[in-house]
């Protein structure tokens, strides 16, 4: 998943207040970007398991996506 998509799924989940219709990989990415340990727990994943489950090419974008979301970047 590229940076723009990681930001997009995180913002979508943030707006909904949950991961809703997102795929498992997208949901885990959103939870990691938004630092939502409660969502990981609800999905029965640890941080390590989530990192193992998401696409390998997504991992380098997590910190940048979190920074962009925290700064109010809106992909839409």
Features from the language model and the residues they span:
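Charged, low-complexity intrinsically disordered segments and flexible loops
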Residues: 1-30, 34-76
């Amino acid at each position: 998943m590229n940076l723009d998509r990681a930001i997009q799924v995180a913002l979508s989940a943030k707006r909904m207040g949950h991961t809703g219709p997102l795929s498992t990989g997208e949901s885990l990415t959103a939870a990691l970007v938004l630092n939502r340990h409660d969502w990981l727990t609800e999905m029965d994943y640890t941080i390590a398991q989530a990192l193992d489950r998401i696409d390998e090419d997504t991992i380098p974008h997590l910190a940048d996506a979190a920074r962009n979301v925290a700064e109010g970047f809106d992909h839409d």
